[in-house]
Amino acid sequence: MPEEGGLLIRQGTIVDATIIAAPSSTKNKRKARDPEMHQTRKGNQWHFGMTAHIGVDVASGVVHTVKGTAANEADINQMAAVLHGAEEDVFADAGYTGADKRPEHEDRDVCWNIAIKRGIIKASPKGLRDLAEPVERALAQVRAWVEHPFHIVKNLFRHKKLRYRGLAKNTAQLHTLFALANLVIVKKTLLVQSRA
């Protein structure tokens, strides 16, 4: 078990999501795109595909939960699905603002470390901004660990586009890819333990 080897501490979770593109072409037998995939806008760019929501252990960087949804599903709606329930701290970006006030999180006794939106920091008075920026920078350094599994899956494993039709098959493949990403993340720790 990962807990026994010190690979999973379960004191805190970093939550994030990424969009994985699906083929948007209609040049197939059905003359249609995958009906389970949806399009969404991120900034001014439109994407068609699904979203991979993950929960990552703060101490080790190991992915403990993966949830796949259509791309148009809001990140905050899947937060409860990627928390394991035993964490003391939750770290998330500004897309999860207000998660601590949602009814599914009322009974959770955790410290919510959710980023403040950039516009709110810019609009605040200079003295308050000078206090908030170093705190936000420190929280961003913790949240940066959640990007490592995404880097491994999308860049090292080159999973930038979905290969199957439907959410079930693609989510199953994401579970496999993130499990393999966990092996890459803990490779040095496992090698040291095997030599001892």
Give the predicted meaning of each segment.
Residues 1-111, 117, 175-181, 189, ...:
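Polybasic low-complexity intrinsically disordered regions
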